[in-house]
Amino acid sequence: MQNTIQEAQRFVLGLWGVRYQVKDVRRSVAFYTQQLGLNLDDQRLPAFAQVSIGNLKLILSGPGASGSRPMPDGHHQEPGGWNRVILQVADLPGRIQQLQETGVHFRNQMEVGPGGKQILLEDADGNPVELFEPAAR
């Protein structure tokens, strides 16, 4: 058992990033860079682009990308769902107001809990993005 764990630890070298399926890579790049302030690292239109902030890499895969091809059983990868990237922000209420003024769609109202405040917005393809402001400690 110990050897299996060690082999698995050597097999996984680290976290590369998070992949989102998108319908229009150019539109998604504009959303993540202009609305959320991520950096554009790589862009190979129309197939894919990579944006980042800190150690987070977000890979935006368009319909023509190798990371978007159907599975062997015919199941198609599609945008949307509930799994999401969580981006830490300061002054969440202020950021919400700014984004609402530019027409960004939110799935819910800001929630406040013991760990902080959060809200879900959608990118142009319906992929959820959570904005999170940790509670003061």
PLM segments and residue spans:
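Short glycine-/small-residue motifs
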Residues: 128-131
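Conserved active-site tyrosine of GNAT-family acetyltransferases
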Residues: 28, 32-33, 99, 126
